[in-house]
Amino acid sequence: MKITEDIIYAGVNDHQVDLFEGQYRVPNGMAYNSYVILDEKTAVMDTVDANFADEWLANVAKALNGRKPDYLIVQHMEPDHSANIENFVKAYPEATVVANTKTFAMMKNFFPKMDLAGRKLEVKDGESLTLGKHVLTFVFAPMVHWPEVMVTYDSTDKVLFAADGFGKFGALDRDCLLYTSDAA
């Protein structure tokens, strides 16, 4: 699904889950959101739940349309956002993982055998990454959910990738309203 001309949704729907985080009923399932930004350089925003590795990697490959990703941006280490970091790194060994200091520290605990030597870009609050025409600015949002959370703002398309800052329960292909607004 295209979000903008250069941003493509690569997430997955989970219709098997009945409780999110073991406590919230989700009768309409869950959506695990991930996006691909296509520019001179490409970026993948977050991964998805571990049970959907193959589907997600296929969605990413389809969105990339034959290109290789330059970056994986990890905004949040909760497993529904990060469980496939290691699978991504294995599938795309040339890609650089972008995250903040706290995220990289947590990543070592989640994936103790994963080697990111020479493949990581540690960002600070307010720093930007230029993909071409898209400029991504990283804004730390600790305790939006977990202490390492950051959000990413694309100033070109004026899109905020909000990690767990906003959202709803429910798969995108069931009982879901898509909200759009005209900024003009």
Region locations from a protein language model:
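Active-site environment of divalent metal-dependent phosphoester hydrolases
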Residues: 77-82, 105-106, 145-146, 167-170
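Conserved small/polar residues in nucleotide/adenosyl-binding loops
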Residues: 179-184
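Metallo-beta-lactamase
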Residues: 2-5, 99-149
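Short, flexible loop segments at the rims of nucleotide/cofactor-binding pockets, characterized by
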Residues: 20-25, 48-50, 74-76, 136-142
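Short, solvent-exposed beta-strand-terminating loops
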Residues: 160-177
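Short acidic, glycine/serine/threonine-rich loops at helix termini
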Residues: 87, 109-112, 172-175
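Conserved beta-strand hairpin/beta-sheet module of binuclear metal-dependent hydrolase folds
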Residues: 2-64, 151-154, 158-162
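Active-site metal-binding motif and surrounding structural segment of the metallo-beta-lactamase
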Residues: 40, 51-98
